[in-house]
């Protein structure tokens, strides 16, 4: 909505433009009227719409044509004033003033126009019959107001309607020639209807209508008012009310009726409450809510956010199988202005779930959102949510102080979402590793083979706490450039034990990106069921890890009838959670011993602190 309104008064000489302005300001008819009034600014706190309003007069005797065009360009709305007792001034509206304001062209945005019939005290019958054909001819005319500067009749109403034409314009909402909502308006209202239809039965119950009413206007409808609304709809629209509930057709009819009766501010209130701008597009503030993350901190969804996401999944999971099919996903995202994830994410994302049907995925969540990295600040999946729930979800994102001011790898992380990059040469088994994370073997490759799964997400328990671990498959050769992004919470460097060259590639990536950093790394020897190949020149994998003070390579295989071991995934999550315990370790036992000792040390410290507290209390 515009932050200020600039009203320009035009019209023939002696029609009363200046008198109207002075009567508004002085609240009395001026005995002496100057040729032109100075520009007047009405403060925001004394206007009904709470916006500052500038009122500008025009005098053909004092201003040039160039000055007039400049004022028209700056005007938010133009009031064309005519004398109801002089028919020639009415005709000038059509032949002179409207073409002058909007250039006589039908292209581009048009300045809204208010027709003002002044001196109604001289013609009691009014002039509406003469003006109606003009209003029908020019759609930019918002309304016509008859008034009298002498009797102070409808003076305040005149400037109120001028404000309203700017702040709540009719043109984007309604086509007066077709007498129906414009497509963009109907589309926006349809989206709002779907968001308000919480039980997804294609109709708004009394409870949903009152929730919608409270969301938009701050209070519910009285029971009788609610019945009156449904009665009006049922009398005018076939199928507008079904089973005592308002359908989409009925909802659209109500808004059309508001506009036709001059109450388009009601429809604008609804649209703006759900994030729409004057051009009927979702505003940047709605699409990209501000999220400030202080240095040394990250942001994650708290349990309220996860509960909300779970409720959305359950709401759209029509067959109650614990997963969303493509059709159910389409239903969920039908109210979104665009895809909730970027092009880097596949269309089918594997995830452990109850459903065993192909091409079924859970409620998608962008790893960037979960991790609180830059993608989180863009909040790409918030725009489609209904306003009250959207606000609740935005509030569920909280700042989590990690004590990691020096970056990943320093101290224990308190985050619940961890990113592991699985790096390795093509063919070493990265995709199988991701499938094994989800409990799938080699014979259970879901999804089209031409669309490999880049991400896999599941929960892992670390020290009795549940963590979300995201595995991201990355081709190792893509990280051989210095500018490549290798950042993560833990790196999984995978090589084929039967292919010496695959280990050499992993070793190169380690030296380039991780050797001098603090990110914990774990080498994994895949296809451990196959015979080892020839030893590569130089250090063996075990010697390489010992030389660089890394944990010994972990053997992994997806072959065999049994599900692959999941211990390696718990280990990766633990390394990401306790990165300071990983570096300098030469074997697995030492690492897990430190984890255990850390937990025991914390418990001992707590007991000693409590004992000291009891001694101090007794001494008092």
UniProtKB/Swiss-Prot annotation:
Q: Where is this cross-link: Glycyl lysine isopeptide (Lys-Gly) (interchain with G-Cter in ubiquitin)?
A: 96, 119, 164
In this chain, Ca(2+) 1 is annotated as bound at 197, 199, 201, 208
Segments traversing the membrane: 595-617
Q: Where is the EF-hand domain?
A: 184-219, 304-339
Major location, coarse class? mitochondrion
Which parts of this chain are annotated as the region Disordered? 340-364
| Topological domain ranges for the Mitochondrial intermembrane compartment | 618-620
Would you tell me the Gene Ontology cellular component terms? Answer: mitochondrial outer membrane
Detail which positions bind Ca(2+) 2: 317, 319, 321, 328
Q: What sections of the sequence does the record tag as coiled-coil? A: none
- Which positions fall inside the Miro domain? 2-168, 415-578
Q: Does the keyword GTP-binding apply?
A: yes
Binding annotation for GTP 2: 427, 429-431, 527, 529, 558
Q: Which family does it belong to?
A: Belongs to the mitochondrial Rho GTPase family.
Recorded hits in PANTHER family, A to Z, give: EF-HAND CALCIUM-BINDING DOMAIN-CONTAINING PROTEIN 7
Its protein name is Mitochondrial Rho GTPase 2
| Underlying gene | RHOT2
